[in-house]
């Protein structure tokens, strides 16, 4: 598995570098970054992408009994459901029974998710549902304004719908970040989330939920018990997250 992963990563990296250098400047600048697919040139990122391809190919094998039925798409916050992350016990409890594939990659912005989706094999049969939570890195580590980040989320949702037209999609509002309600990141995330209902309303099979208040106290304060670094959920917060969305996902999946 590791041999496959490294070979895939090196080959793909070389190809992308040459293609990127050959692309006309006008093409590179024609879209805002939040809605234009963009690769990341980190070896671990390619290795993880290769692992996801291998998981899909295994699921697509007619002899394999486990079929992928749920996609969990996002950044490090979703990535932390994986092995050794604070959400691993929660994943096993709630999402392993739903045959979920973790497509969360640490540090990703909306444009990176778009690239990843474009470079995945088709899942057969199509997944029943997907959950999407992305955008915090657009605001806090990118140069996007809240509306631009929201448009990136809209573009990912359109992409998922185009890939699997019958799949139900649950888009989550970006989780709160930083302890205080008046922190600039908090305000930007609140603004970002305010755009999503209108941006998503015309995309088929899409539902929107904002569960951010579940992590806050009555005064809007984000405790380190919920998010120790004021960004990434603790195991307790992962449990709250899973409890909030699993009933809706099960409904979408007909389970």
Put a short name on every predicted segment.
Residues 69-74, 99-104, 128-134, 138, ...:
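Structural recognition of the beta-strand scaffold that forms the well-ordered cores
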Residues 176-255:
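Catalytic His-Asp segment of secreted/periplasmic serine-dependent ester chemistry enzymes
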Residues 34, 40-43, 82-86, 102-109, ...:
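Acidic/histidine-rich helix-loop elements
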Residues 72, 108, 112, 148-155, ...:
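Extracytoplasmic/secreted proteins, especially bacterial periplasmic and envelope-associated proteins
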Residues 96, 165-166, 204:
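Proline-centered flexible-loop/turn and helix-kink motifs
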Residues 1-73, 77-88, 92, 252-255:
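N-terminal secretory targeting modules
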Residues 79-90, 94-96, 110-154, 159, ...:
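Oxyanion-hole/transition-state-stabilizing segment in secreted/luminal serine hydrolases
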């Amino acid at each position: 598995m590791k041999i496959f992963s490294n070979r895939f990563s090196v080959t793909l990296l070389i190809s992308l570098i040459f293609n990127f250098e050959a692309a006309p400047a006008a093409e590179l600048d024609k879209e805002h970054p939040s809605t234009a697919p963009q690769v990341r040139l980190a070896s671990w990122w390619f290795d993880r992408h290769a692992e996801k391809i291998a998981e899909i190919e295994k699921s697509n094998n007619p002899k394999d009994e486990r079929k992928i039925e749920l996609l969990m798409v996002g950044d490090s916050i979703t990535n932390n459901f994986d092995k050794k992350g604070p959400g691993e016990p929660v994943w096993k409890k709630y999402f392993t029974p739903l045959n979920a594939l973790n497509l969360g990659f640490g540090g990703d912005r909306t444009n990176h998710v778009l690239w990843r989706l474009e470079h995945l094999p088709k899942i057969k049969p199509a997944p029943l549902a997907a959950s999407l939570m992305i955008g915090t890195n657009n605001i806090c580590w990118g140069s996007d304004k809240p509306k631009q980040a929201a448009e990136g989320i809209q573009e990912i949702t359109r992409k998922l719908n185009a890939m699997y037209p019958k799949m139900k999609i649950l888009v989550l509002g970006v989780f709160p970040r930083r302890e205080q309600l008046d922190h600039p990141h908090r305000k930007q995330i609140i603004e970002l989330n305010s755009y999503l209902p209108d941006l998503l309303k015309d995309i088929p099979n899409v539902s929107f939920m904002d569960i951010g208040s579940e992590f806050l106290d009555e005064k809007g304060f984000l405790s380190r018990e919920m998010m120790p670094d004021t960004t990434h959920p603790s195991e307790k917060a992962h449990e709250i997250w899973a409890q909030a969305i699993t009933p809706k996902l099960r409904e979408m999946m007909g389970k």
